[in-house]
């Protein structure tokens, strides 16, 4: 209670000098901020490395703090303190102290980002949301109340008890909050749109410590801004997600060796699927070319929400030696639960590695995709020649995912979002260039390689008239500006909403992680 009284006094002082003055970060104040917070909240003061901290009380089996962060870049950050929050009121207290002292902070939801500062922060306050991970089905309302600290595996396993699910991520270890605030592609996007299009209500702590609900009828401008607009408006502590009936699904990974005939068949089949997808919105597809020690391989993920085995729309991906020039290496396709499929994909992204993603979007075209594959192979080989061949965890990946006409129509049916995409532009393909490696000493080689693939791909697409400016926030690198790609009208709207709900720029200036509105 003493701390709350102190905060009230601090707010009175701030109000007297004007509430619209922009805040500026002051890392030198963070020791005082952490001391203030330790009077009321569960706080662990900084050590020399994140692994020096005590175990989070919310983590079972004595897991280390570092295990809460997927990428090595996040694991190695050294915050001034770690704060465990157990309620929205705790979050409000952290924001109040940060605002009063100008100490920057980061919010850890699922901890799956590789962008520095996104979920762990050097010298500032790291807020652990792991305790806010409840998943409650409210069947009569047709929604699930999901804490912002939950991961998708937790959500799916709980809802499967009632044969229900939501539009969410495809890996069990990805956090709910980050994925939804950045848009969120899903196995169900062809029918229901992005994950953000399926949020009924957001529970949000604002910069002034107020707890509000953002919905279509309450704070509707904030509600729309949160649908793909990122973390510039507040800390979301709960998502109320629309639920629907879901039984067993059919799906899995189909793996082929990397050779020209396979590349041609997969890219052409992918583009054909992207055009035909509106005829069967219950299916989803992605493809990826990856490298691990031993060579390259193609993987195609095929999924059917109705549980149909090999639905006709996937005919072009059957094990046809005449088309592919070779047989599949393996297929994991089976009839199973969504959570099991999410577990399988999660195994492809082990924690503790260094990671960097970047992205671009193009009109779906097989010839362009084949060119991008060539650029990717060339840059991976250059990285191997520069010493990455000795890194057993070096795993570059080129991913392609369709943005189909039915997906973009579904987003409008469900109220729309701020990402600026139109169904007339479809089908599009989102390319993700995600490289994983072990050692900081190889950062420059990897980052240069990723940039070269991206630059060559964008240049080729522009030359062919196939470039689209959209950048998917959840795949965008730190030096990319996804919000800039949303279009002038949406950018101006987001600026107005930010000025209305955060006039001092707390979530712009004191939360450095994530993509901001420029």
UniProtKB/Swiss-Prot annotation:
Q: Which GO terms describe its molecular function?
A: FAD binding; oxidoreductase activity
The record's annotation in SUPFAM superfamilies points to: FAD-binding/transporter-associated domain-like
**UniProt-listed GO biological process terms:** terpenoid biosynthetic process
Name the cystine pairs.
Answer: none
Where does the FAD-binding PCMH-type domain start and stop, copy by copy? Answer: 75-246
Q: Which UniProt keywords apply?
A: FAD, Flavoprotein, Glycoprotein, Oxidoreductase, Signal
The species this protein was found in:
Cochliobolus heterostrophus (strain C5 / ATCC 48332 / race O) (Southern corn leaf blight fungus)
Signal peptide (from-to): 1-22
Purpose: FAD-dependent monooxygenase; part of the gene cluster that mediates the biosynthesis of terpestacin. The bifunctional terpene synthase tpcA converts isopentenyl diphosphate (IPP) and dimethylallyl diphosphate (DMAPP) into the sesterterpene preterpestacin I. The C-terminal prenyltransferase (PT) domain of tpcA catalyzes formation of GFPP, whereas the N-terminal terpene cyclase (TC) domain catalyzes the cyclization of GFPP into preterpestacin I.
Q: What InterPro entries does the database record attribute to this sequence?
A: BBE, FAD-bd_PCMH, FAD-bd_PCMH-like_sf, FAD-bd_PCMH_sub2, FAD-linked_Oxidoreductase, Oxid_FAD_bind_N
Q: Which cofactor does it need?
A: FAD
**Residues with Pros-8alpha-FAD histidine modification:** 112
Q: Which residues are tagged as glycosylated in the record?
A: 61, 163, 208, 216, 346
Pfam annotation, one family: FAD_binding_4
Per the record, the similarity remark reads:
Belongs to the oxygen-dependent FAD-linked oxidoreductase family.
Q: In which pathway does it act?
A: Secondary metabolite biosynthesis; terpenoid biosynthesis
User: What enzyme class is recorded for this protein?
Assistant: oxidoreductase
Q: What is this protein called?
A: FAD-dependent monooxygenase tpcD
In terms of domain of life, where is this protein from?
A: Eukaryota
Q: What is its EC number?
A: 1.-.-.-
């Amino acid at each position: 209670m003493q701390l709350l009284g102190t905060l009230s006094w601090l707010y009175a002082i701030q109000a007297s000098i004007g509430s619209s003055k922009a805040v500026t970060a002051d890392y030198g104040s963070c020791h005082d901020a952490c001391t203030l917070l330790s009077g009321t909240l569960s706080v662990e003061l900084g050590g020399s490395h994140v692994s020096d901290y005590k175990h989070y009380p919310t983590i079972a089996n004595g897991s280390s703090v570092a295990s809460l962060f997927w990428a090595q870049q996040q694991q190695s950050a050294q915050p001034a303190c770690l704060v465990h929050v157990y309620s929205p009121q705790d979050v409000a207290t952290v924001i109040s102290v940060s605002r009063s002292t100008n100490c920057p902070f980061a919010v850890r939801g699922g901890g799956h980002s590789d962008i520095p500062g996104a979920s762990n922060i050097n010298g500032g306050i790291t807020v652990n949301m792991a305790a806010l991970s409840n998943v409650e089905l409210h069947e009569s309302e047709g929604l699930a109340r999901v804490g912002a600290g939950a991961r998708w595996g937790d959500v799916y396993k709980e809802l499967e008890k009632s044969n229900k699910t939501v539009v969410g991520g495809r890996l069990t270890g990805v956090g709910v909050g980050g994925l939804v605030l950045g848009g969120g592609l899903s196995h169900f996007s062809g029918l229901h749109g992005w994950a953000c299009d399926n949020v009924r209500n957001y529970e949000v702590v604002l910069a002034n410590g107020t707890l509000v609900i953002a919905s279509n009828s309450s704070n509707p401008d904030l509600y729309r801004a949160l649908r793909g607009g990122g973390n510039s408006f507040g800390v979301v502590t709960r998502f109320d997600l629309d639920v629907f009936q879901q039984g067993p699904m059919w799906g899995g990974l189909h793996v082929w060796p990397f050779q020209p005939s396979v590349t041609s068949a997969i890219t052409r089949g992918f583009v054909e699927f992207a055009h035909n997808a509106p005829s069967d919105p219950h299916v989803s597809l992605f493809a990826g070319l990856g490298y691990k020690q031993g060579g390259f391989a193609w993987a195609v993920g095929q999924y059917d929400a109705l549980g149909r085995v090999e639905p006709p729309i996937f005919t072009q991906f059957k094990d046809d030696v005449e088309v592919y020039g070779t047989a599949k290496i393996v297929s994991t396709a089976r009839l199973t639960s969504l959570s099991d499929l999410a577990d399988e994909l999660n195994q492809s992204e082990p924690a503790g590695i260094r990671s960097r993603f970047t992205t671009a979007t193009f009109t779906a075209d097989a010839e362009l995709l084949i060119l991008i594959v060539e650029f990717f192979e060339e840059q991976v080989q250059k990285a191997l020649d520069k010493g990455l061949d000795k890194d057993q965890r070096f795993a570059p990946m080129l991913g392609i995912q369709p943005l189909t006409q039915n997906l973009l129509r579904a987003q409008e049916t469900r109220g729309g979002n701020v990402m600026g995409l139109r169904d007339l532009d479809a089908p599009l393909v989102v390319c993700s260039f995600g490289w994983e490696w072990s050692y900081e000493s190889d950062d420059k080689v990897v980052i240069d390689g990723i940039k070269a693939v991206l630059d060559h791909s964008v240049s080729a697409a522009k030359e062919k008239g196939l470039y689209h400016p959209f950048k998917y926030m959840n795949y965008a690198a730190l030096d990319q500006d996804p919000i800039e790609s949303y279009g002038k009208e949406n950018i101006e709207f987001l600026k107005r909403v930010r000025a209305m709900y955060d006039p001092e720029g707390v979530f712009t200036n004191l939360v450095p992680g994530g993509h901001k509105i420029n």
